[in-house]
Amino acid sequence: MMEGYYIIENPGVVPAERRFRMKDLKAWGYDLHLGTIEGERAYFVSKVGERREGEKYQVGGKEYYIEETQKDIPGNARLLARIVIERGNPYLEFWLEEEDTKFPLAKEDPRIILKRIWEKEKLNQLLKHVRAIGLTTDFYKDNVFIKSIPLPYEEYPPKVRRVLREVRDIHRDLTGFGRFVFQYFGEVEKAHNYRLHWTLPTLHLFDVDIANEVDKILGMLD
């Protein structure tokens, strides 16, 4: 993509951490419980539907007791997450903050959780075109089936320009950071020929609503 490309870049800051909702946690595949760990009051998670209220069980030599499975994030608490890179591998760490107390919940491979979300939500564009996941995530889509040179922006049809507006809106209103590189080669037999590379902050893709918006844009010219 060395020539004839159109670029939309928002050089904001990739967030160190981000707040999430219960619907996001459920999409990741977890229930949130209030109970005790080794007799101490705590919040913790288990896989959706795996544990029940009143249940005692052991993990890693520690005893867990579930007093109540939460239907929403408690009003005095925040569900937070961040991406860390350790020995070349990304991890999603998430925890619950209740006033001055922090309850670690899990540390997981973000690639596994994102795949789980995208499969559950049927976000096939994200599943098909993801290329790399770290602090940022790269998508690459090559939909060029003709021999041609990229067209200048002035020759883009209205539908293509609408896609670019949608990308700007995502960067401005939802992620604050992003880089979208686009080449358009024209329309042949009602098929748009284009190539794109899109970089977004990974944390935002754990938000179910944002993931749906990104998937929609990736498929707008198909």
UniProtKB/Swiss-Prot annotation:
One Pfam match, given by its short name, reads: UPF0128
InterPro entries, from UniProt? Answer: UPF0128
Disulphide bridges, residue numbers: none
Family membership noted in the UniProt record = Belongs to the UPF0128 family.
User: What HAMAP family does the annotation carry?
Assistant: UPF0128
Protein's recorded name: UPF0128 protein PYRAB08320
**What organism is this sequence from?**
Pyrococcus abyssi (strain GE5 / Orsay)
